[in-house]
Amino acid sequence: VDLSKYKVLSKVGGALMVGNVKNIPTALVRTGKNSYQGLDLRCTHQQLTSKLVSGTYRCPAHGSEFTKTGAVKVGPAEFGLNKINTEVVGKTVILG
């Protein structure tokens, strides 16, 4: 992900729906000054793709909600979204 192309990632807490990475629906979240976290957007309850709505990832099936960093906010999901490794190289974040 070229950081210079996405203003939403210029601030800590910014989140970008990246699309599919290795067939996994993926988001990228800025978690610190120079740190980013990839998230697998498949709900840990029934594997449907969660969508970012008003700063919260929501599953369309049963209403599970997750924070921007993937922690469970509202069930029925019992586990947070799975993390995807990231590596920052210059102004690019490599996912996976």
Range-by-range predicted roles:
Residues 57-63, 73-82:
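Short cysteine/histidine-rich metal-coordination sites, predominantly Zn2+-binding motifs
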